[in-house]
């Protein structure tokens, strides 16, 4: 909590995992010597960036973008990208932490990551969503790739789920 004092969602995830492994962990002093808990609880990398895009009225909008690369011990980072107004760094660190464990259980060589933005596609035109996603990816692309980080879809990814086509979208 001292390292990440304003991230309650992340604290919750870490505390839940640590409480379930505590008994087994305490049987192995070599885990402590290897600083396993701290290495597991601190993400490898966190990218935080501004996403600037233009809405249908020509106004410049700004959102925050994030990618948490939590752990790649068994393979490239793998995890979804979420677009929702509630997205913040604490939530994405929580989800990346969980994703690391989920992916390890698949037996596929994938680490854990998660990304997203506080952008909400709800109420936006398809063109606005497209402009936002293009701006988001222009920032994110340099940190991902098949051997490094493989994003996937998550909440809010898929413009047709939240918008209905208007006549201006069809032309």
Per-range role (PLM):
Residues 162-171:
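Single conserved hydrophobic/aromatic residue that forms the stacking wall/gate
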Residues 1-161:
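Metallocofactor- and cofactor-centric catalytic cores in central/energy metabolism, strongly enriched
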């Amino acid at each position: 909590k001292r390292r990440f004092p304003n991230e309650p969602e992340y604290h919750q995830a870490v505390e839940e995992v640590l409480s379930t492994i505590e008994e087994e962990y305490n049987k192995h002093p070599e885990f402590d010597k290897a600083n396993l808990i701290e290495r597991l609880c601190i993400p490898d990398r966190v990218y935080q960036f501004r996403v600037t895009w233009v809405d249908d009225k020509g106004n410049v909008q700004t959102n925050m973008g994030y990618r948490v690369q939590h752990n790649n011990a068994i393979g490239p980072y793998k995890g979804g990208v979420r677009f929702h107004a509630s997205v913040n760094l604490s939530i994405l660190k929580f989800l990346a932490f969980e994703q690391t464990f989920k992916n390890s259980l698949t037996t596929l060589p994938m680490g854990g990551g998660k990304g997203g933005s506080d952008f909400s596609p709800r109420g936006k035109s398809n063109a606005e969503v497209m402009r936002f996603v293009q701006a988001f990816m222009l920032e994110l692309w340099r940190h991902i790739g098949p051997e490094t980080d493989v994003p996937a879809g998550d909440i809010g990814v898929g413009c047709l789920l939240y918008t209905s086509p208007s006549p201006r979208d069809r032309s």
